[in-house]
Design a protein with these regions (language model features):
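Residues that define the transmembrane beta-barrel architecture of outer-membrane proteins
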Residues: 65-71, 107-111, 157-163, 227-233, ...
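Residue-level signature of outer-membrane beta-barrel architecture
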Residues: 75-79, 119-121, 169-171, 237, ...
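Outer-membrane beta-barrel "beta-signal"
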Residues: 274, 319-334
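Transmembrane beta-strand segments of Gram-negative outer membrane beta-barrel proteins
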Residues: 37-53, 84-86
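Repeated loop/turn-to-beta-strand initiation elements of outer-membrane beta-barrel proteins
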Residues: 84-86, 123-128, 174-177, 246-249, ...
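Sequence/structural signature of outer-membrane beta-barrel proteins
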Residues: 52-58, 93-101, 120, 136-145, ...
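Extracellular loop and loop/strand-boundary signature of outer-membrane beta-barrel proteins
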Residues: 57-63, 98-104, 148-154, 220-225, ...
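Transmembrane beta-barrel strands of outer-membrane/channel proteins
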Residues: 47-53, 90-96, 131-137, 165, ...
Length: 334
């Protein structure tokens, strides 16, 4: 009897221990019962494609068939922890147009990266002590169509870099932010020597003498400058408002002036866009971009009255304008 009781007690103890162990293991391994730790990172990924197509078949009034496409991408990664904020944004655009009996032509080309680190005194403030880095260039060669023999721009020709420190007011709820830096270094890169020799995009042009053997050729005494550095004041602003249901008005403005060279002459880059959202995947947009840089000389064609040859001469700085109207598909993903 004692042996039976002892055996029964041992079995009950083992059974109880087994049940407890299973409960512990089940509690430990069940992912649904684990606490969710919020991430300090937020991200945004949006890609879009605008397509415009016109076709004419036996159209008596005349016309040229064409098709255009514009790819757009916007990506962002933002890290916020306590009083620290680090935001990174990447914007990319590339557009092509094909008309009947003409070559494929580029209509838009841009890649821009913006990185901003900010520190605020308390987590309730919208004011940050900030450091900002901007970089923008293009993907492929640009031409003055129909002339495609010599590119007028290339990858890293030009490229613009901004690096500075200042203050930023960032309001996520109202989707707006303003940045002011009294100390910003601006670097213009023209890493194509032919374009640098011409003084393209504000770099110092090269000096040459005509080739005595072939007067049409040039002997470069001093090559053009590939890098231009400026030091000045930078202001950037961004606002996005819903002006009507599913109608959004977005503005981006950048102003820069150099302390050392023509202080007060302001470089302007203003981009405004009106988005009309049909649904989560279809959107129409109207955009205008205006650029003015006092160091960039526009060109105009002139004809020599004696020889009849055509050439281009500097025509002073001019405002640059681009207007876009498109309807296309958008897709956002995590």
């Amino acid at each position: 009897m004692k042996l039976f009781r002892s055996t029964l007690l041992i079995l009950l103890f083992v059974f109880s221990a087994t049940i407890s162990a299973q409960s512990i293991i089940r509690t430990t391994l069940d992912p649904g019962e684990l606490p969710v730790i919020p991430s300090n990172w937020t991200k945004k990924n949006v890609v879009g494609l605008d397509i415009t197509q016109i076709a004419f078949i036996n159209w008596n009034a005349g016309g040229t068939s064409s098709i255009s496409g514009l790819f757009k991408g916007e990506f962002s990664r933002t890290y916020i922890k306590k009083n620290n904020k680090w935001s990174n944004e990447l914007f990319a655009k590339y557009g092509l147009n094909k008309q009947e009996e003409t070559e494929l032509r580029k209509t838009d080309d841009e890649v821009k990266f913006i990185s901003t680190y900010g520190f605020r005194k308390d987590s309730l403030s919208n004011w940050f002590y900030s450091a900002k880095f901007n970089f923008n260039t293009q993907f492929t060669n640009g031409y003055n169509y129909p002339n495609i023999d010599k590119p007028i721009s290339r990858l890293f020709a030009p490229a613009y870099l901004f690096l500075g420190a200042g203050v930023e007011n960032s309001n996520k709820e109202k989707d707006r932010k303003f940045y002011f830096s009294p100390v910003t270094l601006k670097t213009t890169l023209v890493l194509d020597q032919d374009l640098a020799n011409q003084g393209a995009f504000g770099v110092r042009k090269g000096e040459f003498i005509p080739d005595p053997v072939n007067p049409d050729d040039k002997i470069w005494i001093t090559p053009g400058q590939k890098v231009k550095t400026e030091f000045g004041i930078l202001f950037e602003g961004h606002m996005k408002n819903e002006v009507y249901k599913n109608v959004f008005f977005e503005n981006r403005l950048q102003l820069y002036t150099d302390y050392l060279h023509k202080f007060g002459n302001i470089d302007i880059d203003y981009d405004t866009r009106l988005d009309l959202v049909v649904n989560a995947y279809v959107k129409a947009n109207i955009g205008i971009r205006v650029i003015y840089d006092d160091d960039i000389q526009s060109k105009k064609d002139v004809v020599d009255p004696v020889t009849g040859t055509e050439s281009q001469v500097d025509n002073g700085p001019r405002a640059q304008l681009r207007q876009v109207l498109g309807v296309g598909l958008v897709y956002a993903f995590k």
